[in-house]
Amino acid sequence: EAKNTLIFIHGFSVPSYIWDDTFKSACKKGYKSVRLDLYGRGYSSNLDSDYTDELFANQVIELMNELKIERATFLGLSNGGRVISKIAYLKPELIQKLVYVSSSSFQEHKPMNDTSVSGKEINDFIKNNYPSISKGQMLDFKYPQNFKGWDDKYEQLLQYEGFARALISTRKNHVNLDLENKFINDSNIPLYTVWGDSDSAVVYNNFKNKLNKLMPRRIEYFISNSGHLPNVENSVEFEDILYNKILKEN
């Protein structure tokens, strides 16, 4: 009989391959494991709609229904932390545990009055960002020299029509998730936060006081020698904590 179900949610722009190492190790260990590309990323549809946390949450919930998964442990990386917070708020009965990895769910956001995306914005984004956006992915690592070719993988994403619009729309639809995160803390859902010790993309010290107020009962871990992607950069330490601590706790 398989162990518990793990659902891996990727971050802002890099799709499900960001979870490759952990997904494969989880499968080998006998966990039922699911990963997916959220709308606008990788192989999923590029929708002509607002890319909100709720859109992504409902996408995951629909997939769970399709696969007849009743409950799961969710691992949300970076922007994926926002998605798992929204899922837990909408459907807490689906949640076994929540694992936030380098999560951007706790930052401050000022709601935008206009969340539409114009053709000019898309063209400007492609012109100004596409030449360097792949190389910029290397900044997620503490030691980028150890991950040659990581940026080439990202370059393939730029060929998909609708990718730029999805990124712009997602950013424009970011709002504070204080209500959702407080709801989670007040629930009985086990919750964990995991951080790279040298993350320059989501800087822990910028929001740790807010996080301590919102989620004081969380259990927290820091992964050594890693930046924004501790699951990739120090997979040995990350997986030791995941399998031998987080997933073993009742």
What are these regions (language model features)?
Residues 217-250:
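Catalytic active-site module of serine/aspartate enzymes centered on a nucleophile-bearing elbow/loop
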